Amino acid sequence: MYLFHLCLVFACVPCPTVQASKLCLGWLWDMDIDPYKEFGSSYQLLNFLPLDFFPDLNALVDTAAALYEEELTGREHCSPHHTAIRQALVCWEELTRLITWMSENTTEEVRRIIVDHVNNTWGLKVRQTLWFHLSCLTFGQHTVQEFLVSFGVWIRTPAPYRPPNAPILSTLPEHTVIRRRGGSRAARSPRRRTPSPRRRRSQSPRRRRSQSPASNC
């Protein structure tokens, strides 16, 4: 339904339906919806990362297909991160179809404006979403949260009072990614070496030294 309203607004058709579409979309845009809250993060933390930090969509889609194609295309519910990736891929596919349709029915100038706007707004949001959930599946959700908080603190600290290099996700405490039965993955913290127990002395009775013949004299 919202895709239909977006199509009418971008087409700029002078009819009462466009006004209704703007009202409908205005109600949607005024809602304070943050899809990262349930994962312990927020839009604000992700916006601290620069725009060129996130890989392009083709690289993210290829990564998702290479690592989690079985889970994403299966019927089972693996995790909320898998569900979010599915929804992001479906939304981007539908948006691409809308852009294709509008490109065929609008002028070159209008098409260029629309494509630039989509890449700088919705395209960026899809890149952020895919990066966040793929990183949570790869490194662990808690590790990604620590990275976002650390980077947010680093970027807001004046340059003379902060380290020269920004935090890097791969240098944070590592988690071993293991695959459970059923295709799901879980993060396991590295094992700590426990001190080996001391060897107990043999409790067998000591042998008496045999007395030499000279001691009997």
Swiss-Prot record:
Propeptide, residue positions: 189-217
Region (HBEAG): 26-28
Biased composition annotated in UniProt, kind: Basic residues: 178-210
Disordered as annotated region, ranges: 166-217
GO biological process entries: microtubule-dependent intracellular transport of viral material towards nucleus; symbiont entry into host cell; viral penetration into host nucleus
Sequence repeats: 189-195, 196-203, 204-211
Main location: secreted
GO molecular function, one term: DNA binding
Sites annotated Cleavage: 188-189
Assembly information from the UniProt record: Homodimerizes.
HAMAP family hit by this protein: HBV_HBEAG (MF_04076)
Name of the protein described by the UniProt record: External core antigen
Organism this protein belongs to: Ground squirrel hepatitis virus (strain 27)
Gene it is expressed from: C
